[in-house]
Amino acid sequence: MVIGRSFGPPALADAIVELPLPGGPNERPITTGFPDKGALILQRTRPPLLETPFEVFDQSVLTPNDQFYVRWHWSVIPTEIDVGSFRLAVRGHVEKSLSLSLDEILALPHVELIAVNQCSGNSRGYFQPRVPGAQWSNGAMGNALWTGVRLRDVLDRAGVKAGAVQVRFNGLDEPVVAEAPDFMKSLDVDHARDGEVMIAYEMNGQQLALLNGFPLRLVVPGWYSTYWVKMLNDIEVLDQPDTNYWMKTAYTIPDTPHASIRPGQTDVKFVPISRMVPRSFITNIKSGDTLRAGVSTLARGIAFGGDAGVSRVEFSSDGGKSWQEAQLGTDEGKYSFRQWQIHFGLPTAGNQLLMVRCTSSSGEAQPDTPNWNSAGFMRNVIEQTAVVVA
C-alpha cells in the first residue's frame, strides 16, 4: 500500500497575515496548498516551512493536525511511501541488527503522551539585531497527543552492547547535493532508553501527516524539535560521541545563562541545544486591540514549562509593575501546553502593556529581558501585548 501526496507551492496566497516582526517583512501569505494541511503561514516553499497562525492556540490545548507547523531542512522529501515495504533499521553497537516493518512496530506495546513540539528558532523574527534564518513569529510550535512505542523497547529488541554512548537517528529526507550533510541527530544512550522518548505513528488520534513525519517520527519530550526526526527509518547505536555536522556545528548555543551573548561576542563555548525553557502567551488579546476602561476583561492563554511542568502563571496589566496569579486549566502532563485565564480591569484610558510569566515546576521563570544569539534560538522572554484602553 502506497500512501503519499504530491505537494508544491500554491499558485496564489489564500490570504495575507500581518506579523509584527521588528525586522520585517510584516506581510506573509496564508496558504492551504500543502497536503493534509489547512490554513498556515507560508515561510518557505522548498523545503516546506509553514507556521501555525497564532489564533489557533486560543482554540484548544491541542493543536489540530491540519494546522500543526511544518519545518524541514532538505527539500528532497518523499511524496509517497510504500507502507508495505517500509522498514526501520536498528543497527550499530547492538547484539542483533533489526529491520522492522510497520506491522512489527504496531505490534509492540503502545504508549501515549501529550507534548509540545517547538522549533529551536521559534520567534526568531523578534531577535534584535536580526539574525539569519526563517523569520518565525510565535507559531513554530504545537502541542499534540502522540501515540507510538517506547524507543527503549525497540532498542532492547536489538540489545544495546556495553560501551554504547549515543543513539543516532536518520530519516528519509535527503540533501539536494551529495556533498551536503545528511540530517541526523543523536541522544545519549541513557536518555534514549529513559522510557519517555517515543517512536510515534499517530498524532491526536490520527496517522501522522506526511509533512509531520509519516510514517514514523521520533518524539523527545521536553526537547526542541530538532531532535524529533521525521520519516524516521534508521537508528544507529554509537560507541563514541556523534560529531556529525548537525550535532557539532549546527543547532549549538552559547553555554551561558539563557543562551545569550552580545552581538559579535566570540569568547564563548558553544554546546548542542537540548531542553526547552518556560514560555507563556496571551492568546485572546493581541497587540493593538482596544479594551474598555473600568470593566472586567478576561485574558486567557497557554503556558508550558519547557522540560518540566507549569507551577504557576502570573499576569500583569500594568507593564510588570504588579502581578496576579492566573487560574490554571487542566494539567495534561508536564510536557503539554497548559491553559490559563484571569479577569482583570484597566481603570483609566491610555496605552498599557499586558504581560504573562510562567514559572516551571523546577522553579525556572521566564526572564525580563530577551536573549540574543546568532542562531536566533531559545527565545523565552516575558512577552508583552500593547493595548489601547478607551
Language model regions located:
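Structured, non-membrane catalytic/scaffold regions adjacent to prosthetic-group chemistry
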Residues: 14-390
